[in-house]
Design a protein with these regions (language model features):
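Short secondary-structure boundary/capping segments
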Residues: 20, 42, 67, 123-125, ...
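Class I SAM-dependent methyltransferase SAM-binding "motif I" and its flanking Rossmann-like core
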Residues: 11, 82-155, 198-201
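A contiguous loop/helix-start segment that scaffolds small-molecule binding in enzyme catalytic cores
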Residues: 2, 71-75, 131, 139, ...
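Short, active-site-adjacent cap segments at secondary-structure transitions
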Residues: 37, 84-86, 112, 194, ...
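Residue-level signal for well-ordered alpha-helical positions
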Residues: 42-43, 118, 174
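Class I S-adenosyl-L-methionine
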Residues: 1-109, 208
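Short hydrophobic alpha-helical segments that form membrane-spanning helices or hydrophobic packing faces
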Residues: 15-17, 114-116, 171-172
Length: 251
């Protein structure tokens, strides 16, 4: 069987308990070598066959897994973050289905949540934003017209923008064109949860200059939100006058 496992954002301790258990038991591991922390591989069996998918095609990945299945071996396909977010796992799962290979998916901590932890920031503040948009700027992978940054910006929601740091100037221009004000807070977090994590804060008007000398050109998340440093309303969940199914109002 194949277990598609989310490795989490980088810190080896942020893999799930189930993901760790599968990784420790696997006979074959195929990992996204350019993104997954190699420290995770230290918990694998000493005789496990380990492959770096960064140099492989889809057909090569599937061929290794198919051979492992024929030999009765368990495979872990180790992806960074959560496999369902920009993980390119659908084409793999479809290939497994066509070949009759059983598989499951173990979710992981996506980098947008590691970024929130690094920033010590909640993305959904009452009166500010109750929506989080996970997206990317258009690059080699096309983006549907209704999902272009300019149109998503009209919602004024918290936005977590993946895979776009090399196009930061274009991202900023699209966000402003879509309705965000120049003074909207923005944060760039590189390698969230890794020892070499970097955080740069600014506004849409300043951020391109703010990161110019920081050496941030890959593996970084862009977060734009009024939640970043904003005044906000207190949640009703803990208000003394608020009643819910577990607690009656005290005022």
């Amino acid at each position: 069987m194949v277990h598609i496992v989310g490795a989490g954002p980088g810190d080896p301790e942020l893999i799930t308990v189930k993901g760790q258990r599968y990784l420790q038991a696997a006979d074959v591991i195929i990992y996204a070598g350019s993104l997954v922390n190699p420290a995770l591989l230290k918990i694998c069996k000493t005789d496990a066959a380990i492959y770096n998918s960064a140099t492989m095609t889809l057909a090569e990945v599937v061929a290794i897994i198919e051979k492992a299945e024929q030999e009765g071996k368990m495979t872990v396909r180790l992806h960074t973050g959560d496999p369902s977010v920009y993980g390119a796992i659908q084409e793999q799962m479809d290939a497994f289905t066509k070949k009759g290979i059983a598989y499951d998916v173990v979710p992981g901590v996506s980098s947008c949540f590691a970024v929130a932890a690094a920033l010590k920031q909640e993305y959904t503040l009452p009166g500010i934003s109750q929506t989080v948009i996970i997206t990317r700027n258009e690059g080699r992978t096309p983006v549907p017209d209704m999902e272009k940054l300019r149109k998503l910006a009209s919602h004024q929601a918290t936005m977590c923008i993946y895979l776009s740091i090399t196009m930061l100037d274009k991202v900023v221009a699209e966000l402003i064109a879509g309705g965000y004000a120049d003074d909207t807070p923005i944060a760039i977090v590189q390698k969230a949860s890794w020892p070499e994590e970097k955080i740069v804060r600014g506004t849409l008007a300043t951020i391109v200059n703010d990161i110019a000398d920081k050496g941030i050109d890959r593996t970084a998340m862009i977060v734009v939100s009024r939640c970043l440093g904003a005044d906000y309303e207190l949640s009703r969940l803990y208000a003394p006058e608020f009643t819910h199914m577990f607690r009656k109002a005290s005022q």
